Swiss-Prot record:
InterPro entries: Glu-Q_tRNA(Asp)_Synthase, Glu/Gln-tRNA-synth, Glu/Gln-tRNA-synth_Ib_cat-dom, GluQ/Sye, Rossmann-like_a/b/a_fold. Binds 1 zinc ion per subunit. It comes from Photorhabdus laumondii subsp. laumondii (strain DSM 15139 / CIP 105565 / TT01). Catalyzes the tRNA-independent activation of glutamate in presence of ATP and the subsequent transfer of glutamate onto a tRNA(Asp). Glutamate is transferred on the 2-amino-5-(4,5-dihydroxy-2-cyclopenten-1-yl) moiety of the queuosine in the wobble position of the QUC anticodon. Its cofactor is Zn(2+). GO terms for molecular function: ATP binding; glutamate-tRNA ligase activity; zinc ion binding. SUPFAM superfamilies: Nucleotidylyl transferase. A motif ('KMSKS' region) lies at residues 232-236. Zn(2+) binds at C105, C107, Y119, C123. A motif ('HIGH' region) lies at residues 16-26. It is an enzyme of class 6 (ligase). Its EC number is 6.1.1.-. This is Glutamyl-Q tRNA(Asp) synthetase.
Length: 316
């Protein structure tokens, strides 16, 4: 079992990508990470994960920040933009290369798909040139599971855990698994609160933390909001942006989804009073491991919960 060490001061974060506006699913993650930080009397930071320009929607970053403020989720310190962190990412890439922990790979997605979806280290010992190549992390000490403060101990598919994963894409963009580790360490994040759809890459990120001799944060993976078809609410699935009218009803819906105690007269409180009450009553143990929420529109939300444990098994 991998245990993390963290300093006394709590630092959490919310790191949306500007590929679309804030929707109800991302609001749940924002509220969960915000309340966990405030209940721990810690800081709550905002980072804009804008490392993939082709997927960015113009103006989305500023609209996300405006929506967070509208819902009373005020952050601490300055906003960090990943697009301004390329020098730091290159430094770590060079460090891994000098340590013999990375290599160039020219394998296509089609080839990997033909061999059951997992990379077989085909290019590991070929010493390929940089031309038209991705950079892969050379796994020497794979991580096969980790402790999640909500989900419990999660086991990874051994084949996935041992895979040499991409840390720099052939199109010149930095990979998520690399930059999230570098930036969470840079910001001093002590606990990562995010959705269960990001459970699988966690073991890869922990492997990087260990190889770079960085402190591993604690992890909390929250249940996902689903649409009426059972699909995750996401920008790719055209989830509707959260409305910018009275924030209280949707705040209460998000708290209900997280199975928090919602006192009947909370709807009579102001937005800030509501968040203060939510912080005072915040109970991590009440959050379901899995949740299901059916949304036909922003005025009709039905929540159900399922507390069965889960394992890392799907391929992202």
């Amino acid at each position: 079992m991998i245990k993390s060490e963290r300093p006394q001061a709590y630092i959490g974060r919310f790191a949306p990508s500007p590929s679309g506006d804030l929707h109800f699913g991302s609001l749940i993650t924002a509220i969960g990470s915000y309340l966990q930080a405030r209940a721990c009397q810690g800081k709550w930071l905002i980072r804009i994960d804008d490392i993939d320009p082709p997927r960015e929607v113009p103006g989305a970053a500023s609209r996300i920040l405006h929506a967070l403020e509208h819902y009373g989720l005020h952050w601490d310190g300055e906003i960090l933009y990943q697009s301004q962190r390329h020098e730091a990412y290159c430094h770590v890439l060079n460090q891994l290369q000098q340590q013999g922990l990375s290599y160039y790979c020219t394998c296509t997605r089609q080839r990997i798909h033909q061999i059951n979806g997992f990379y077989d280290r085909n290019c590991r010992e070929l010493n390929l040139p940089i031309d038209h190549a991705a950079i892969r992390f050379k796994q020497r000490h794979p991580v096969y599971g980790f402790e999640d403060k909500l989900q419990g101990y999660l086991n990874a598919d051994p084949v996935m855990a041992e895979e040499d994963f991409i840390i720099h894409r052939r199109d010149g963009l930095f990979a998520y698994n690399l930059v999230v580790v570098i930036d969470d360490d840079y910001q001093g994040v002590t606990e990562v609160v995010r959705g269960v759809d990001l459970i699988e890459p966690t073991v890869r990120q922990i492997a990087l933390y260990r190889q770079l001799n960085l402190k591993i944060p604690d992890y909390i993976h929250l249940p996902l909001a689903l649409n009426k078809d059972g699909n995750k609410l996401s920008k790719q699935n055209h989830a509707q942006p959260i409305p910018l009218d009275d924030p209280r009803p949707l705040l209460i819906e998000a708290l209900s989804f997280l199975n928090q105690s919602v006192i009947e007269n909370w709807q009579d409180l102001s937005r800030d009073q509501l968040l203060q009450k939510a912080t005072a009553h915040w109970d991590l143990d009440r959050i379901p491991r899995q949740g299901k929420i059916h949304i036909d529109n922003m005025n009709k939300v039905t929540v159900s919960h399922n507390n069965h444990s889960q394992k890392i098994h799907s391929r992202l």
